A protein has these predicted regions:
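N-terminal leader regions that mediate targeting or early regulatory function
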Residues: 1-129, 134-148, 168-170
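Well-ordered alpha-helical scaffold segments within catalytic/enzyme domains
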Residues: 150-161
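Alpha-helical bundle/repeat cores within regulatory domains of eukaryotic proteins
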Residues: 160-170
Length: 170
C-alpha cells in the first residue's frame, strides 16, 4: 500500500486552523522553513555560488524552467479584465494540470536513485497550486506555501537533502 495520497483541504473554520497550528504537520513545515533559513545564513546567492548544484536541484530547475517557458505560448488576451487575464486559465490547465504530471514524473526517472512514481499523486497538486488558482485567477500566500510543501515532500522522500537547502533558499 502506498504512503502517498492526494492532498485535500482541511482548514475551513477557525477551529480547523487552531488544530492545524497544534499539529505535527505544522511543526514540520515551520522546521523545514527554518532549516532553509539556516542553510543560507552567511552564504552568497546561489546564482554566484561556485558549488555544484545537485542533480535533483537541477531537475527541479528544469521543471520550473519548463513551466515558465510555457507562459510564452499563452499571451494575455487584450481585454479589460478586472480580475486577471483569462489566458492564465488556459496556461494553468495545459501547463500545470496536464503537462506537470509528465514533468514531475521525470524527476523520478533520472539517475538519482529515487524512482517513486506513486509520489506524483501527492506532489502534483502542491506543484500546480503553487502558481495560483485558475478558477478565481488569483495568487496569494497559500499558493506560496504549496510550493514549500512541494519541496518539503521531496525533502521528506529524501529526493532532496540538507545540501540542497541553501539552493532552495537562494
Amino acid at each position: 500500500m502506498s504512503t502517498f495520497k492526494k492532498p485535500t483541504r482541511g482548514i475551513y473554520v477557525l477551529d480547523d486552523l487552531k488544530q492545524f497550528v497544534a499539529s505535527k504537520t505544522y511543526s514540520e513545515i515551520v522546521q523545514f522553513i527554518r532549516q532553509i533559513v539556516l542553510a543560507v545564513k552567511g552564504k552568497q546567492n546561489a546564482a554566484n555560488a561556485s558549488d555544484s548544484i545537485s542533480e535533483p536541484m537541477q531537475n527541479i530547475y528544469e521543471l520550473l524552467k519548463y513551466t515558465f517557458n510555457n507562459i510564452q505560448k499563452f499571451p494575455p488576451e487584450q481585454t479589460n479584465n478586472r480580475f486577471g487575464n483569462k489566458s492564465y486559465r488556459i496556461w494553468h490547465e495545459q501547463t500545470l494540470v496536464k503537462d506537470a504530471t509528465v514533468q514531475i514524473a521525470k524527476l523520478f526517472s533520472s539517475n538519482s536513485g529515487n524512482n517513486n512514481q506513486e509520489a506524483v499523486l501527492e506532489l502534483l497538486p502542491y506543484y500546480y497550486d503553487s502558481f495560483g488558482n485558475a478558477t478565481r485567477i488569483d495568487f496569494g500566500t497559500g499558493h506560496e506555501v504549496n510550493f514549500i510543501l512541494f519541496l518539503l515532500c521531496l525533502y521528506k522522500m529524501k529526493y532532496l537533502n540538507d545540501m540542497d537547502l541553501s539552493f532552495i533558499g537562494t
